[in-house]
Amino acid sequence: MVQKPIPLPDGSMIRLTVSRYYTPTGRCIQKPYENGKMEEYHHDLIDRYNRGELMSADSIHFPDSMKYNTLVTERIVYGGGGIMPDVFIPVDTARYTDYHRKLVASGLVNRVSMNYLDRNRNRMMAKYPKFQQYKQDFVVEEDLMEELLKMAGDEKIEFEEEQYNRSKPLIMLQIKALIARDLYDMAQYFQIINDDNPSYQKALQIINNKETYNRLLGR
């Protein structure tokens, strides 16, 4: 939805919804909502997850009333309920364990990254003055992972070894990306985190393949 920020006298701000959101092709992607159905609106994402829509394209169904022809190529897409991608990438749930969720939700992954940089900022800037050098050479060491586990124990987060081992590569990537964000900028965070983003990598593959691009997005 499109929201207009309105400053208030006490320094706070409200964001007032003023219109639905349309893409440049003229396609409405506003999630539908009706008066009296607020609970359904807020539970939409979890309901889609429970129906398997994030894991299998076959679980997603659109009524014909949502069909829309794009303005230029006249491809059939579906409007009014979010964007159905041209190429469906299922969510990989294997690495996103409950233990990983607790570490992130408690702020520990972010905190251990900040603590590391507070101790090593000058050394890191001297060793990695350029981001590309950092991206290529910096490795999250086991000592830092042990520090994270100790912090988790102090917060009474019960250690789950099997879940930790499954999520460990993802946690290490997130720590590296968070350090890059604070050492350089947000753009560098995404350059690292997107290296392991299947949707992003598939999009790059399609964009860089003219034949595939035209087949999927042409008239």
Question: Which role does the model predict for each range below?
Answer:
Residues C28-I29, Y33, M38-R219:
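Conserved functional hotspot residues or short segments at active or partner-binding sites
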Residues V2-M38:
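Conserved phosphate-handling catalytic cores of large alpha/beta enzymes
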